């Protein structure tokens, strides 16, 4: 009661200031609840809270939706969540020979890379592990750059993303620390750099999965488009490291992709390439020497 009379006896201006301060604090609290509530929070927020069978792409979505702008710079934007596209450049189909990395006379595809000195020793080991995932069972070899004109520049920029296929000259792969430094995420981005799109982008995907359009966040519907890509005469790969998870870009925690054959089929991978992922690499690059 004493505090009430003290407040009552303060000047009118003091009471106004006090009320404004209280109102501001409440506004901040309500704003935070609005921005980060399951219903209105960042894309897939509720889905990630309720489902623990995550994929590499789920981690990429988490990193990019929370921290990375879809506009990387004035002329480059992100498509399908993590594919960097420059204005005026075709982005989707990369099975023309012009966007593949060159194959050596010894039958291997040597992809040169430069690693940012900003990464710690442990982070460097994780990145190399992600590259080794791709090397095992394929003819692709990642080598530190010496004099090569075409190479991948690995940088801790904002978010996890890569260009599609070889662009010629220096091209960036962004692996933000620590969010993108997971082995599966790293392998996923390098697969884009080798020329591979997301598995559910295949033109024949409707034979294998159902896209639940009403469950997808409205401004991410384009991430589920189909494209005329070369499927390399290989079966649809539910377990590809390039496949979206079942709850990718869910606005309400409900599935956005459902397998047609069985709802028990797991979509995507968390950390390793599937057997078919490796077959894709070997067929696309016409590998004859498949070292283990």
Please report, for each region that a protein language model flagged, where it lies by residue.
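Polybasic, low-complexity terminal segments and linkers that are predominantly intrinsically disordered
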Residues: 2-7
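Zinc-dependent metalloendopeptidases
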Residues: 8-292
């Amino acid at each position: 009661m004493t505090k009430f009379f003290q407040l009552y006896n303060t000047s009118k201006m003091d009471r106004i200031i006090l009320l404004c301060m209280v109102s501001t604090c409440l506004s901040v609290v309500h704003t935070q609840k609005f921005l980060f509530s399951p219903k209105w929070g960042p894309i897939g927020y509720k889905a990630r809270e309720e489902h623990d069978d995550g994929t590499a792409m789920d981690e990429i979505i988490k990193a990019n939706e929370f921290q990375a702008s879809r506009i990387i710079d004035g002329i480059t934007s992100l498509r399908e969540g993590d594919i960097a596209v420059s204005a005026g450049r075709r982005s989707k189909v990369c099975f023309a020979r012009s966007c593949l990395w060159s194959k050596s006379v010894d039958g291997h595809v040597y992809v040169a890379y430069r690693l940012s000195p900003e990464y710690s020793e442990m982070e460097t080991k994780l990145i190399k592990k992600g590259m080794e995932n791709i090397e095992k069972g394929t003819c692709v070899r990642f080598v530190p750059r010496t004099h090569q004109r075409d190479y991948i520049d690995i940088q801790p920029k904002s978010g996890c993303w890569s260009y599609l296929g070889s662009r010629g000259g220096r091209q960036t792969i962004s692996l933000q620390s620590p969010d993108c430094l997971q082995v599966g995420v790293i392998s996923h981005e390098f697969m884009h750099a080798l020329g591979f799109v997301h598995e559910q982008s295949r033109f024949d995907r409707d034979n294998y999965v159902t896209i639940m359009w009403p469950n997808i966040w409205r401004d991410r519907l384009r991430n589920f488009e189909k494209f005329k890509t070369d499927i390399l005469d290989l079966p649809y790969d539910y377990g590809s490291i390039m496949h979206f998870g079942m709850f990718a870009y869910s606005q309400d925690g409900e599935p956005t992709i459902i397998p047609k054959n069985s709802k028990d089929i797991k979509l995507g991978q968390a950390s390793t390439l599937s057997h078919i992922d490796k077959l894709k690499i070997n067929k696309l690059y016409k590998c004859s020497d498949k070292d283990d």
